[in-house]
Every structure is written in structure tokens, then in C-alpha cells.
Amino acid sequence: MSLPIFNFTKIESTNDFARSLITEHKIFKGIIIADEQTKGRGRYGNQWSSPKGNLYFTIFFPILRSNLKKIQFLVQLQIRNILKSYNIKNVSLKWPNDLYVNNKKVSGILQESIVFGKLFLIVGIGINVKSSPKIKKYPTT
């Protein structure tokens, strides 16, 4: 499957941009990549710190409702496998959307779906590569 790619130096949110591509521009599949997000978010609208030097991207496409739950776990497994392929050890999964290395969060996945004529899946992924912001109370980004 060939997907259009949208690259940004800075964007508010890759997931929000995917939603606008679907609903406003009638583009129904693609990949959005950003060097930095100014309004990145996780589950429940929690802020996802998105400074330069890390990976932020969203993949969006039409999907059957019966496949929705499978995708989240498959994405987690693939990210874990990629990290392990770089000889990163002690990678663990925290259902439903986080990956940890040495008990510190290094990746978050935000899966959203919308109906616009048919069902679309929007999967946002953030991976700390260069920086892992310090949060006083929780070891997350």
C-alpha cells in the first residue's frame, strides 16, 4: 500500500492534522511526520512533551471495526521489536499504549478512530530518542 507522506518541522499535533486531512481534504490514508509537536497529547488529552530530537508520527487509514483492537497491540509489538533490533534491552509493554526501557517510558501510542462515511484509524506514535523530559511525579514524557 502506497501512502502519501507529510513532513513538518513543527506542527501542533500529527493526529489532529490526520483528522483534518480526512474530514476537510478527503485524504483517507497517509503518514505524518514531525520534528516537533506544540500540542502533542496522549490518552485522555494528557500532554505529550514533543521537543526536537525524538520521533513523532501518525499513520491513518480506513479500517474494519473488527480490526480496531488488534492494531494497538500489534503496533506495540512492532515498536518493541524495532527497539530490540537496535540492541536495546529491558523493553517492556504496558497495555494499552506505552513502552518502557529500564522501567522508564520511552514511547506512547495514541489510537483514535473517526467515522467519516466509513471508519478511519489514526495511530499517533511518539518515541523518545534524544530526550526524555523529567517529570517530577511520574517517569513518563
Predicted regions and their residues:
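Short, acidic (Asp/Glu-rich) active-site segment that either coordinates a divalent metal cofactor
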Residues: K118-T141
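Acidic (Asp/Glu) carboxylate-rich active-site/surface patches
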Residues: N81-G117, G126
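Solvent-exposed residues in well-ordered beta-strands and their adjoining turns
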Residues: F60-L64, E112, N128-K130
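Glycine-rich, flexible loop/turn motifs
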Residues: Y44, P51, P96, S131, ...
